[in-house]
Design a protein with these regions (language model features):
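Active-site anion-handling motifs in enzyme catalytic cores
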Residues: 1-169
Length: 169
């Protein structure tokens, strides 16, 4: 397994390379919606409310937006910033999940199909319970991600990936 190139950089490097800043002055849960209806929006809104957070929806594909607190598109710096400063993330995007890992965020991911690489990565990190079947209810019990242990696993996978890439050149 070679990590996705996004994971070859640490969060420190991402923060040095990009001018990441908090775009909102309040706590929020981010729902990065690449696929429509990956999560029940009402359940996500209730979840955000229980955390005492605003719900922000980031559309993965530009769409005409009429709903309040919906962002129709974001450039790469805005995308990374939205993830870094979120209190919790719901995503139907592989890279939404990866950046959640990079910035040590609590998250749930859901994919309708082609979830093999997400499932493989989350299994290798012992986080498969954070991969929710498409259109399933949000679990009531959430196992908090221990990023001390996850960081060690990602660093180990990063080292193996770098070694493989160097030996392949």
């Amino acid at each position: 397994l070679v990590l996705d190139p996004t994971l070859l950089l640490t969060n420190d490097i991402w923060e040095r390379v990009f001018p990441i800043r908090n775009m909102f002055n309040e706590r929020y849960v981010l729902y990065y919606r690449l696929l429509r209806n990956s999560f029940n929006e009402k359940q996500v809104a209730d979840f955000a409310q229980r955390l005492g957070c605003k719900l922000l929806i980031l559309e993965g594909r530009p769409r005409p937006t009429i709903k309040k607190d919906t962002i129709s598109s974001a450039n790469p710096i805005e995308f990374i910033s939205l993830i870094k400063y979120a209190d919790f993330i719901f995503t139907s995007s592989y890279h939404g999940m990866v950046f959640s890992l990079i910035f040590h965020k609590q998250f749930f991911a859901s994919f309708s199909e082609n979830s093999d690489r997400a499932e493989s990565l989350l299994t290798s990190l012992d986080l498969k319970d954070h991969l929710i079947p498409h259109k399933s209810d949000i679990p009531t019990h959430i196992r908090k991600i221990d990023y001390t242990s996850i960081g060690l696993k990602i660093n180990s996978l990063r080292s193996l990936s770098e070694k493989f890439l160097k030996e392949s050149i």
